[in-house]
Amino acid sequence: MDPFVYVPADDPLFGAVDCALDHDAGTLVVSGGGLPRAEVRRAAGTTPESHVPIGTRDPGSLTLRIDGIDETLRPSKGFLTRRSYRVEVVSGAQGCRYLLVPDSLGTSRLSRDGGLLGVFTSTGDGSVTAEWQAEGGSGRGVGPYDASVGYALAAAFGTGAEPMWKLTLNAVLDLWP
């Protein structure tokens, strides 16, 4: 099956950004807009989960490569709180830590070392939009590497999560006979 390539995101800082997501094959490639190429891959033989665009949240079954360099990818399992759906990247190449955390039903915020970089929206189908903060949170501007990480995480895992009360109610109802 060919990867799904959507109309490129029109990023306000970097121009056209392509996200090619293939749920069945477990691959995502982010490119264009002067960004370093980002690839997220699901390990062969891993049964895909339909509610995760890349197919799994198991860190042992995923790899992240940006500009040819393997980075540490740590998606949380996701359960009762929005924060439990966070995805962390520890970047040896950049010497920093990125975190994508849901902050509403449809959006997630990307931070670098605790400083807000921007807010992403993705419905989990490979289409992604970004709204950047002017200073990138820590006084450093948002760079192409930051954008590549953000687009890759948003496209691979989707953005947003239900509020805690609804997640809790759904968990209780799932246990009800």
Which residue ranges define each predicted feature?
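Surface-exposed, interaction-prone regions used to assemble/regulate multi-protein complexes
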Residues: 77-79
